[in-house]
């Protein structure tokens, strides 16, 4: 009898709680309609195969077949013997997920706070340059996807779209700006880039510290392929008023005669060793010198030191992230300016 009464009272109490607080069940036990798992349900619900495989292991082969080999190798390759890249992959694969059972995970919270701001995703889209060589929509497509998924996007200085174009495509999404730091003699150019980024809603500055010159990348060298020469990956610079002014000044100071300039053009036309190569050079005749000028500013071989970070602090009022692999000696210097670090060993190997 006592057990029955206790059972009835428990049932009544549970019933009253549910009736009195109907929102409790909804809030705690109904799956999030915006959860990423919805993509899985959409695939099954479509009753047809997805356009692309859901297996990341198959994407590499698919990309190799879809785009020119030189373009693929530029994205795929790493520096030197690529041993550091392989070691990083191996280390990452040793991480394991350790799920907990019988815990309330219907409404999972994967949000994280960075620099005082809450983000829905603990992941960010890394700064990947020259995206136009793999898809015609380039960084604008990435910006739209980042907004739709509510994942922060980091725009590369080596983008094939301008700062303003990417900001427009990203709308009210979260976006950071990665800086390939121009040489000290072009500080006005650096200031202009950061001013444009700030004005277009980029909230965090990510400074790459190990690419003051183009890395030794055997795949690209064997193909003699550098997209920047053809103007791809230079759009952030080409769209900058200070850069344009600097380039025009450089051109106006060129005192060579017309004959000397034509001789240079002729020598360049002969370099590819084929008519098709010469035709490509000729079609890019106005772009190549401008592209080389941009590359000379952002990959000049002029290295910075820790004291130069104070310059960035003056030019940028928001958070600054240092993107590099530290050694122990560097840690003492870096403690003076807050930052985080990570690098995928594309430009350097060890």
Predicted segments with their positions:
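Short beta->alpha linker loops
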Residues: 79-80, 157-161, 325-326
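Alpha/beta enzyme core
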Residues: 130, 144, 169, 183-350
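Short, conserved beta-strand segments within well-ordered enzyme catalytic domains
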Residues: 96, 111-113, 122-126, 152-154, ...
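Glycine-rich active-site/cofactor-binding loop and its immediate structural neighborhood
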Residues: 119-158
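An N-cap/entry alpha-helix motif that binds or orients negatively charged groups
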Residues: 19-116, 224, 228-230, 241-285, ...
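A gly/proline- and charged-residue-enriched helix-loop-helix capping module
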Residues: 148-190
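Generic secondary-structure signature for well-ordered alpha-helical cores
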Residues: 80, 90-97, 151, 198-203, ...
């Amino acid at each position: 009898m006592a057990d029955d009464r206790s059972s009835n009272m428990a049932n009544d109490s549970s019933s009253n709680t549910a009736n009195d607080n109907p929102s409790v069940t909804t809030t705690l036990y109904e799956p999030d309609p915006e959860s990423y798992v919805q993509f899985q349900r959409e695939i099954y619900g479509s009753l047809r195969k997805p356009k692309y495989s859901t297996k990341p292991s198959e994407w590499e082969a698919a990309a190799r077949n879809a785009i020119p080999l030189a373009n693929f190798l530029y994205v795929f390759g790493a520096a030197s013997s690529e041993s550091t890249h392989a070691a990083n992959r191996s280390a990452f694969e040793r991480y394991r997920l350790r799920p907990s059972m019988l815990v309330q995970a219907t409404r999972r919270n994967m949000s994280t706070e960075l620099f005082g701001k809450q983000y829905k995703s603990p992941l960010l889209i890394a700064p990947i340059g020259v995206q136009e060589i793999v898809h015609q929509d380039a960084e604008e497509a990435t910006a739209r996807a980042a907004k739709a998924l509510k994942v922060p996007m980091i725009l590369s200085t080596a983008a094939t779209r301008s700062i303003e174009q990417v900001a427009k495509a990203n709308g009210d999404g979260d976006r950071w700006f990665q800086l390939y730091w121009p040489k000290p003699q072009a500080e006005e150019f650096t200031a202009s880039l950061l001013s444009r980024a700030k004005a277009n809603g980029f909230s965090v500055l990510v400074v790459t510290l190990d690419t003051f010159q183009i890395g030794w990348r055997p795949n690209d060298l064997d193909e003699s392929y550098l997209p920047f020469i053809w103007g791809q990956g230079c759009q952030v610079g080409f769209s900058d008023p200070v850069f344009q002014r600097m380039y025009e000044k450089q051109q106006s100071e060129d005192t060579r005669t017309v004959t000397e300039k034509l001789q240079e053009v002729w020598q360049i036309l002969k370099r590819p060793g084929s008519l098709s190569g010469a035709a490509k050079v000729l079609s890019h005749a106005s772009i190549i010198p401008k592209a080389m000028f941009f590359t000379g500013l952002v990959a000049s071989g002029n290295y910075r030191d820790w004291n130069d970070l104070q310059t960035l602090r003056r030019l940028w009022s928001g958070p600054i992230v240092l993107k590099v692999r530290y050694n122990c000696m560097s840690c003492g210097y870096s403690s003076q300016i807050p930052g985080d670090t990570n690098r995928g060993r594309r430009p350097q190997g060890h």
